[in-house]
Amino acid sequence: MTAALHTSALTSLPLLARGKVRDNYAVGQDRLLMVASDRLSAFDVILGEPIPGKGALLTQMALFWFAKLGHLCPNHLTGEAPESVVTAAELPQVTGRSMLVKRLKPLPVEAVVRGYLAGSGWKEYQESQSVCGVPLPAGLKNAGKLPEPIFTPAAKAEVGEHDENISYEQVEKVVGPELAAQIKKISIEIYKTAAAFALTKGIIIADTKFEFGLDENGTLTLMDEVLTPDSSRYWPIEGYEAAYAAGLNPPSYDKQFVRDWLEAVRINGKPWDKTPPSPQLPPDVVAKTAAKYQEALTRLAG
C-alpha cells in the first residue's frame, strides 16, 4: 500500500486553503487543483492519524458519481488531467487522488438530504418530531426510512467549527428564494437517483450532503465531493433489518465506525469532549476504516 498522505505540500502552485480532507491549490485564475488527502475528520475535528488510501478511494468514488449523475446537474470537473499542472516531482502527491476543477463561487449552504432517520436527525426527531423544521410523522424509529427524502440544510462552518442546521427559510434569506428552490429540488433528485442505484448494489444511502457553487454565468454547479462515505451514511443492506428492529445504528461503510469508537473511548475516565486534540486511533481502527472505504467502492463500482 502506498504511504498515507496526511498533508500535501505542492510548491509549484499557490495553496488557497486546507479543508478537513482536501487541499486546494490555484491553477491560474479560473481553476483549482483539489488534492484529497488521507486525513479523516470526525465531529468536525481533524484526527491525527491518516487512513491509508482514503484520498484515492474518495476521489474514485466522487468521479464515479459525477459520471453517473452528470445528466441531472452540471459539475465542477474540467475533464483535464490533474497531473498536467504539477511538476514531475509532485506527481506522487497528486496521482489518483486529485481533481482539476472549475473555480466557482461557493454557496454557503450544505445541501443535506435525508432518506432515513439517523444521527443528529434522530436526536432532533425525538425532541421535536421534526428535523430542521420539517415536521415528520409520529412513531418513526432510529434508522427508519422516511416516507419521502427531506431537505435539511446546514450553514457551512469554518474548519474546526460545527456545521449548524438551518431552516429552509434561512436558506432563502442567504441565497434567495429562486436559488434555494433549485438547490432543494436538484439535491433531492440527485439523492433519489443515487440511492436507487446504490440499492441495486446492496447499499443503503441513508443521507448525504452536497455542495454547490455558481459558475461565471450564474449556473448552479455541483462541486467538492459527491456521495462519498465522508459526506454520506452508507449502510450495507445485510444487517440493516436486524439493527432497525433492535433500534440500533446499522453497520456502516462510512466513518461512523470511527465515530462510534470515539464516542466509547475514555480519557482519564471521561468521554472525549470533541475538541482538538483527538484521541489517537489504534492501528486496528485505522485498518478497519481503510477496509470499509475500499469495500464500499468495490461494491458500488464493481
From Swiss-Prot:
Catalysis performed (reactions): 5-amino-1-(5-phospho-D-ribosyl)imidazole-4-carboxylate + L-aspartate + ATP = (2S)-2-[5-amino-1-(5-phospho-beta-D-ribosyl)imidazole-4-carboxamido]succinate + ADP + phosphate + 2 H(+)
Top-level class of the enzyme under EC nomenclature: ligase
The keyword Ligase is assigned to this record: yes
GO molecular function terms listed in the Swiss-Prot or TrEMBL record: ATP binding; phosphoribosylaminoimidazolesuccinocarboxamide synthase activity
Pathway note: Purine metabolism; IMP biosynthesis via de novo pathway; 5-amino-1-(5-phospho-D-ribosyl)imidazole-4-carboxamide from 5-amino-1-(5-phospho-D-ribosyl)imidazole-4-carboxylate: step 1/2
GO cellular component terms given for this protein: cytoplasm
Matches recorded under InterPro entries: SAICAR_synt/ADE2_N (IPR028923), SAICAR_synth (IPR001636), SAICAR_synthetase_CS (IPR018236)
Enzyme Commission no: 6.3.2.6
NCBIfam families: PRK13961.1, purC
Family in the record: Belongs to the SAICAR synthetase family.
Listed name of the protein: Phosphoribosylaminoimidazole-succinocarboxamide synthase
UniProt organism field: Polaromonas sp. (strain JS666 / ATCC BAA-500)
Gene that this sequence comes from: purC
